Swiss-Prot record:
Disulfide bonds: none annotated. InterPro entries: L-lactate/malate_DH, Lactate/malate_DH_C, Lactate/malate_DH_N, Lactate_DH/Glyco_Ohase_4_C, Malate_DH_AS, Malate_DH_type1, NAD(P)-bd_dom_sf. Homodimer. Catalyzes a reversible NAD-dependent dehydrogenase reaction involved in central metabolism and redox homeostasis between organelle compartments. Peroxisomal NAD-dependent malate dehydrogenase involved in fatty acid beta-oxidation. Reoxidizes NADH from the beta-oxidation and provides NAD for the conversion of fatty acyl-CoA to acetyl-CoA. Does not participate directly in the glyoxylate cycle. Required for maintenance of photosynthetic rates under photorespiratory conditions, and carbon flow during photorespiration. It comes from the Eukaryota. Expressed in rosette leaves at low levels. Disruption phenotype: No visible phenotype under normal growth conditions, but the double mutant plants pmdh1 and pmdh2 show seedling growth arrest 5 days after seed imbibition. This is Malate dehydrogenase 1, peroxisomal. Its main location: other.
Amino acid sequence: MDPNQRIARISAHLNPPNLHNQIADGSGLNRVACRAKGGSPGFKVAILGAAGGIGQPLAMLMKMNPLVSVLHLYDVANAPGVTADISHMDTSAVVRGFLGQPQLEEALTGMDLVIIPAGVPRKPGMTRDDLFNINAGIVRTLSEAIAKCCPKAIVNIISNPVNSTVPIAAEVFKKAGTFDPKKLMGVTMLDVVRANTFVAEVMSLDPREVEVPVVGGHAGVTILPLLSQVKPPCSFTQKEIEYLTDRIQNGGTEVVEAKAGAGSATLSMAYAAVEFADACLRGLRGDANIVECAYVASHVTELPFFASKVRLGRCGIDEVYGLGPLNEYERMGLEKAKKELSVSIHKGVTFAKK
């Protein structure tokens, strides 16, 4: 490689060349195959909304993941700065930035996993559904580009309200003829992370050793922790069950209020999103028994979408697990969750079909 090519390679994150021109004139790297020199083969990951409150820590943590060989960072503003900053980290993933709608398709071409934290954050007094009118349109636009440029990629949706944005993405993919229920997942991992943490606090355990299934959806009463199925098995009083359920359901509000208008749960959300993305990549690699909770197309209930345990594999979701035995408190919670979820799903589908 001559010096000009080396310089072009190093500075590509600041002003990514057009993919079609690159192929036509044979200069620079083939973006689809680019990888750090000496880096081990891995997966190509795009983050849409990479310059936001969730996107920045998410991008940093994904740059640290050894399973990532190429990391594309897209946003409508500030993407070059975030990309330049993260690209200085001495890990093997090649980082490239993409700015604005004209570069969206190039950002998505050839990706194995697309993570979407794009959208506006919650502020005090706002519910996740208050975000709907802004974030629904963003998710629809991004999903249309995914359907065109990387229809076989696994898609992780973080943008709230997840209960509605996942159905929106599904409808866009159906319209494009690319919908694969195994590859579309709403990220509810933060509910699981919170549940593990709060249960560990109550029971004086190491949170890394606690597993709490959280099913339903990703907002308020649709978040249903199955405390009867905690591992290791724990015995809770009714007061503890009610306290834990309420705190898990309102963990996001707790952070929004604590930040007093300065943001929402960005850092813990980025951590949870990376945990889930890593599980998806390990599944793609062929690792066995990768089981996490996610909001997916489902037959577990009568609703078309529902969060439950899923087993991840080379094609995305290999299996969607049922709920298992529920106690009376959980059965009552399930009925409340389904009622609200049904409205949110319908809202998303209706928006996408307009």
